[in-house]
């Protein structure tokens, strides 16, 4: 098939990762090597599990920090250089700013762990049904500016971007090519995560928009 890179998702029933530790990465790395594959991007499950970047309760906050820290270390041992993340979602019964402040704090701490492990964090936006604090480009820019760490970057998710009514060009104009290091590149309408042709996006134009802005990251 010509596939050379994989974005591994640490989630049941694939890879075991929690706030206490993670499975032995050596057999996984050996399988990748045996098949001529690399894992440039590592994604700890952060949507369907209880771990999130803007957790409120002190115990949960620390468990989330340990979980994502373990994800950074796990990814590093598999040869990844990017940890995929999202903004976190805050709580629906509190002001947006409260969840936002916790997300900033979490990413500042995790960015230090990433730096120690030669990893970058790539943060995507979510949909308005998923997050109060990170579904629009201005919110992600605010988060990016407040975290203010060289190991904290952003990524484009075509579905979240489409739902928000944004464009690829807006993202490059807002963040600059050097700060967009990854992409979730799927068809949508505007919701959904579809194979290309099942949604209404223009594949050729989207690729051209990415490449014409100097994008050199992966498409997953």
Residue ranges, per PLM feature:
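Histidine-acidic metal/acid-base catalytic patches
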Residues: 1-2, 29, 33, 79-81, ...
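Glycine-rich, proline-tolerant flexible connector loops at the mouths of alpha/beta enzymes
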Residues: 7-33, 87-94, 194
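Active-site-proximal loop/turn and secondary-structure-junction residues that shape catalytic pockets
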Residues: 10-12, 45-48, 87-91, 125-129, ...
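Active-site-proximal flexible loops/turns
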Residues: 14-16, 48, 93, 131, ...
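Short glycine-enriched, charge-decorated loop/helix-capping segments at active-site entrances
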Residues: 15, 54-59, 195-197
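Short amphipathic alpha-helices and their capping/turn segments at secondary-structure boundaries
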Residues: 19-38, 66-77, 104-112, 167-177, ...
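Active-site acidic/histidine proton-transfer and metal-coordination neighborhood
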Residues: 51-153, 163
